[in-house]
């Protein structure tokens, strides 16, 4: 692959002068030469002479029978050198079908584009194939009185493409930040006229800079003074004299995390389109908030699931591109039926969710019927293809109150499944008849449900990501159990675990959860090689003599050596059975198996106990996260970390909480603000680890 500095060549076979002009303007400044050719013979000749990095083939310029795929096969057939090929299909020719894409891919194409062509995206693709990475320069403000030290830091940051501004007067910090708009601030902890802690307090009080990462440059070894600086809002320390490795690692990670939080804040507050579509995770979080509110808000709310009938047949008939165009038209029609208060999302490839509100139940049912009629009138753009489109619509009602967002999805999906099994192209409304007007299930009924679930594999695991703030690359999820009920809903653990405990069923449930966790870890070991699961257990389950041999056998049977779950215990359980907990935790640690204790309030007795029994992680109680101020929370985090216990701040459900918790420097954060629990491992840890 040629380097941009020595020049890269791209050959274009085609006659679109506008494309040639616009593409040249975008790639020439990157030292890429674009050569236009008018015939296949000229291309074959120049291919040998110029050895280009990329060839762009316009189907309109190819007259070979078999199209682009056949031409590529001929072009590459006798050549040892194969540049990467971008194929452009002809508009309205039917060349956007899956068959043509597959044929081109198998003949050697690296990319297959269908008009209309975005020249900017094409240019970006060409540059990547030429080995030219387009980078964004991030800005770092350095507040340092020592000019030579500041210059050294600026030079080190320049080597990784950072733009820097050195400031030596702390009194000018806000003015310089307003003008420079940095992505991160590096400042000396001790400055003439003001300390770094004081300046950080002022910066955090400024609306524009509240969330900007601030790292201190210091030789300060006094833990109390470090703590005071962190309490003021600092994000961390870089020890003087600064080493290149420590500087770059700290800066890149803090900026990456800051950008993620800014992206998340933007995502939560935006609409994908003017039609009221939301990203799926934002939609689910909004649904969760409405579900938990449980107060009458006027009108009748419902979750509407729209499931396209015969989806595989549509995909086979139209191909991927035409199918997506059809679904875009469906989305447009759906948005026209929505009021400004309503929102929708694409749940998966062929299912949509609509959070609807109408004045009465009959009007909500009428909406579902209207959706069936309107969406069933969709036709593919290619009128020669005879295709009937229909949808099955299911409406899940909020009355009686559901436990969470996924219970609501279960209601709507059950109704949609009923509509589909009845022949499709119709709407069904979820019935609450089996729930006795919302009355809670009797304990005897729940006990029978648990027994049935144990006998018939009636439990589910959902997974919620736990995000490291300390540059760990593991993918850590908490595995959360749910139970399927007779009416198709999913019962959260709070509703059945206490009953199971009184019925002495917890050892069997604990084993089911661990066994299922092992199955997931084994199945996902290739796709998620750094996966770790946090798995709930009870002290007395683990203390039983037969438990450890069973646990070891599960690991050996699935060849999961060195791939262990993290076992999670409840603080109240540990306090009640501290002697047993200490014994088996010590045994587990010898094998490298970690233990997390949850619902830690942060009182001195708990912190001391966690250190004595050898727990490696502590998950703070929700009420501690909600009620403690930033200084109190920081002191709890620091006290645990000083004893070798890493801290998980859970219950991060909104921007205000994440902003407050962020500066307290826990090791991990978890909550619905990151992602609601999902039935699959879908959080983008890779983006978090390597975006930068």
UniProtKB/Swiss-Prot annotation:
It comes from the Bacteria. The keyword Cell cycle does not apply. InterPro entries: CheY-like_superfamily, Cyclic-di-GMP_PDE-like, EAL_dom, EAL_sf, GGDEF_dom, Nucleotide_cyclase, Rev_trsase/Diguanyl_cyclase, Sig_transdc_resp-reg_receiver. The keyword Repeat applies. CDD domains: EAL, REC. This is Uncharacterized 76.5 kDa protein in phbC 3'region. Residues 443-691 form the EAL domain. The modification 4-aspartylphosphate is found at residues 58, 188. Residues 299-432 form the GGDEF domain.
